């Protein structure tokens, strides 16, 4: 590795940028502090960010406490403004690329089998001729989301450009395409970019008007309402199975190419922790059954790999991959800031300022492959009546102790029971709560409250003010609209706008 420590005027003091010459199979790593941004330009050679190829002579902006790497397999020169961070020749991307080749072969063989084109002797390695359904497990700060994103990006930019694998996120602490507390899935057909920690899996159609098709994702979302799986694991298992059932319905409807594309599941770090107990095992089993998993990828942990091999190795291929050296520790304070940024991003969109050292008139500054000016939203603040929106809480703090349950009743029933919330009650906790607006039930018949847990989400709002005497509340939403007759669910996720 090397760099050219000179400024735009050729001086050698106080450079505003650096030119890094990356050797083959090496990567440039950076971690951004709050309220900072950098611009990265590929000058020559080949480079990618988690499988998304960078174009030459285009400035890519990164901000929002982004922690990422620029990797090259053949060598390249990049320009960084302002000068920051370091390079490393220790990278796990080669291992991730090898895994992606295996999954590509599975897709091709699966499609050939469906089309009747697979002939005996053309698969000497006995690679499974089934779509790859991949469950990714690993401890906290192991780079699970990074691996999932890289595998998706390698799939959609390969020789078969019509692959559209489904990316599933069952980590409620992540937020993915919406807000923390949710789990979701989306079909991906073009690469996902990395520019900010608030958009770990790219943008969705609900976050801002976009141009590039990969950002116009319409995810299927279910509301859990907490960031920790221990809060209500019964509810989490229920919505994981609901999500799996909806994905199965979609796979029946799509063509053979879509089914052969497979899916990749990102999981919470608690799935890798033995301290989570039996609930953790039941949630892993729910994922395997609901998404028909045939491959388990374990990042780093040898003990976890041995456990998964012992439990599922007879029917599922369990593979261990090394943890990337670029995976960094995120302390609780950082995670809280990121979750706050995700909610703010959902409401207001995202814009990264051009960093110091970059000429404001220089070329195109892209964020998520979009012009930076196109990513802001103008959220709507609306006053609604308490009677316009029916609010529920699923189990949670209002659950009765086991000793108080009726004879024969089970805790599982209580954990899934919707409880009506009265906003006029001082103890309701509605103020500053994130409310998930539920989609309408498909059936025209009589609906029961118990069925609310099975409904997906079509949007989120935040209660910013309560007027108890007039029985009104003010809600913030990304777009304007009417909320009359809506059903919403609240839990433990809240947000306050900071001036």
Functional labels for PLM-detected ranges:
Residues 117, 137, 161, 166-263, ...:
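Nucleotide-state-sensitive switch-loop elements of NTP-binding domains
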Residues 145:
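Walker A/P-loop
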Residues 211, 278, 283, 448-450:
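Short, well-ordered helical secondary-structure segments
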Residues 148, 240, 280-281:
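Amphipathic coiled-coil/heptad-repeat helices and related helical stalk/stem segments
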